[in-house]
């Protein structure tokens, strides 16, 4: 093997071994894969910070120890633009300090200002998450509704085709007029009280009846 061959190295870490060994296709098909953990009812820890189910999804900045830079009632789009401009200005100020006064104590202040601006930007973006979740749910439900309407329409089209096929099948059946005519041509015979045929076997007998009687006599 040549040493010049490139060694392929994945830029992503390998998947966890427990998922490979436990959640195989065979285990899932045989219902042997472990069940997902039950929902957490009480407090839990995420990224080293304690949380509770009773807490708000988006906690206020004051409860997290940050100073609020905008009022309680505001336009989020306008404030995000202002924070973005402030972030750019403070970043340029930090670059200017690093170039001209690298040992200035204002460098730490600018870094703190940048951190606070980033926190506020992320907080405003996170406040859009509930709206994003509702909008995602609305779009998903509209998609499901459209798919079900299309499925119902396809069923209706198939039903119309089946009805048309049944109608054509009935229309292609043979006409029963000849059979009805043949059945109507056989007149019923009158039977007297003694059980004999009315008129005997004389001229009043139907030709077909006479033919049938002759066939029976020959047997």
Swiss-Prot record:
Keyword annotations from UniProtKB, A to Z: Activator, Nucleus, Transcription, Transcription regulation
Pfam families xref list: Med7
Gene Ontology terms: biological process: regulation of transcription by RNA polymerase II
Keyword Ubl conjugation annotated: no
Nucleotide-binding found in the keyword field: no
InterPro entries on file: Med7/Med21-like, Mediatior_Med7, Mediatior_Med7_sf
Cellular component GO terms held in the UniProt record: core mediator complex; mediator complex
GO MF, any single term: transcription coregulator activity
Subcellular location: Nucleus
Function: Component of the Mediator complex, a coactivator involved in the regulated transcription of nearly all RNA polymerase II-dependent genes. Mediator functions as a bridge to convey information from gene-specific regulatory proteins to the basal RNA polymerase II transcription machinery. Mediator is recruited to promoters by direct interactions with regulatory proteins and serves as a scaffold for the assembly of a functional preinitiation complex with RNA polymerase II and the general transcription factors.
Family: Belongs to the Mediator complex subunit 7 family.
Description of how the protein assembles with itself and partners: Component of the Mediator complex.
Listed name of the protein: Mediator of RNA polymerase II transcription subunit 7
Organism in which the protein naturally occurs: Anopheles gambiae
Lineage, highest ranks first: Eukaryota, Metazoa, Ecdysozoa, Arthropoda, Hexapoda
């Amino acid at each position: 093997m040549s040493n010049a061959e490139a060694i392929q190295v994945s830029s992503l870490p390998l998947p966890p071994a427990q998922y490979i060994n436990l959640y195989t296709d065979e285990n899932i098909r045989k219902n042997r894969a472990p069940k997902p953990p039950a929902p957490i009812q009480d407090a839990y820890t995420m990224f080293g910070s304690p949380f509770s189910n009773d807490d708000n999804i988006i906690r206020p900045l004051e409860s997290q120890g940050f100073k609020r830079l905008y009022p309680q009632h505001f336009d989020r789009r306008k404030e995000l633009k202002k924070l973005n401009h402030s972030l750019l200005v403070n970043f340029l100020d930090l670059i200017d300090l690093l170039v001209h006064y690298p040992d200035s104590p204002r460098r730490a202040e600018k870094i703190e200002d940048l951190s606070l601006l980033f926190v506020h930007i992320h907080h405003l973006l996170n406040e859009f998450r509930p709206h994003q979740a509702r909008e995602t749910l609305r779009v998903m439900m509209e998609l499901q509704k459209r798919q079900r309407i299309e499925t119902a329409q396809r069923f209706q089209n198939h039903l119309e085709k089946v009805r048309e096929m049944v109608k054509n099948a009935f229309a292609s059946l043979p006409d029963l007029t000849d059979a009805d005519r043949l059945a109507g041509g056989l007149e019923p015979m009158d039977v007297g009280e003694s059980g004999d045929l009315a008129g005997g076997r004389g001229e009043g007998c139907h030709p077909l009846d006479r033919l049938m009687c002759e066939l029976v006599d020959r047997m």
